[in-house]
């Protein structure tokens, strides 16, 4: 019996059957069953790769847009700074010119006085005119002299150079202006340098 089986295995038909036989099962069938499960996983990975690429491209585009916007803002800032510097310079020149213009007539009269050959009285009158013009020029710039002689001493606007004993005027009244003081509107430019009275009778009373 075994010899007969052995002989059948040696025939061409038996050899083909032996080659097609699978003692451990059918591997082809098992592989065919695994392929459908692997295909969805590969599809998921492919979609993830595409999503990451899209995010990368979007990030690169955002970075380029940000760099362009930053460059534009920097250019606008530089232009604004240059424009502000130019306007400041023009305003300063205008202010200086406006101030100097008020004193040009005063300078003209000084030059005329130097060239004058008149008498001492005429020269004095010319100087008085120049002083008046100077005062008007200062007032046109809102620069006002501080009141002194006859006013009560005010340490906010007066600086006492000396106290002089006087009984005919109130104590601490300004009796002499040594140097004129000025203010521009309400702001003090410089205090007036003055001499003030010291009335001992009023002090004792």
From Swiss-Prot:
It comes from Acidobacterium capsulatum (strain ATCC 51196 / DSM 11244 / BCRC 80197 / JCM 7670 / NBRC 15755 / NCIMB 13165 / 161). Participates actively in the response to hyperosmotic and heat shock by preventing the aggregation of stress-denatured proteins, in association with DnaK and GrpE. It is the nucleotide exchange factor for DnaK and may function as a thermosensor. Unfolded proteins bind initially to DnaJ; upon interaction with the DnaJ-bound protein, DnaK hydrolyzes its bound ATP, resulting in the formation of a stable complex. GrpE releases ADP from DnaK; ATP binding to DnaK triggers the release of the substrate protein, thus completing the reaction cycle. Transmembrane segments: none annotated. Belongs to the GrpE family. It comes from the Bacteria. InterPro entries: GrpE (IPR000740), GrpE_coiled_coil (IPR013805), GrpE_head (IPR009012). This is Protein GrpE. The keyword Lyase does not apply. One of its GO terms (biological process) is protein folding. Keywords: Chaperone, Cytoplasm, Stress response. Homodimer. PANTHER family: GRPE PROTEIN, GRPE PROTEIN HOMOLOG, MITOCHONDRIAL. Residues 1-40 are annotated as: Disordered. It is found in: Cytoplasm. The keyword Protein biosynthesis does not apply. Its main location: cytoplasm. Gene3D superfamilies: 3.90.20.20, Head domain of nucleotide exchange factor GrpE (2.30.22.10). One of its GO terms (cellular component) is cytoplasm. HAMAP family: GrpE (MF_01151). One of its GO terms (molecular function) is unfolded protein binding.
């Amino acid at each position: 019996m075994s010899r007969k089986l052995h002989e059948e295995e040696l025939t061409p038909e038996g050899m083909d059957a032996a080659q097609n036989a699978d003692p451990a099962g059918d591997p082809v069938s098992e592989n065919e069953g695994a392929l459908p499960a692997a295909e969805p996983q590969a599809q998921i990975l492919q979609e993830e790769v595409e999503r990451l690429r899209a995010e990368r491209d979007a990030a690169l585009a955002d970075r380029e847009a940000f760099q362009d916007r930053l460059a534009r803002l920097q250019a606008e800032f530089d232009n604004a700074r240059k424009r502000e510097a130019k306007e400041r310079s023009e305003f300063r020149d205008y202010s200086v010119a406006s101030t100097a213009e008020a004193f040009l007539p005063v300078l003209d009269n000084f030059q005329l006085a130097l060239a004058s050959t008149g008498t001492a009285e005429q020269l004095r009158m010319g100087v008085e005119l120049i002083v008046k013009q100077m005062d008007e020029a200062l007032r046109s710039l809102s620069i006002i002299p501080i009141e002194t002689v006859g006013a009560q001493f005010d340490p906010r606007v007066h600086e006492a150079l000396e106290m002089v004993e006087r009984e005919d005027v109130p104590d601490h009244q300004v009796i002499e202006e040594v140097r004129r003081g000025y203010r521009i509107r309400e702001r003090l430019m410089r205090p007036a340098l003055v001499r003030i009275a010291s009335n001992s009778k009023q002090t004792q009373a």
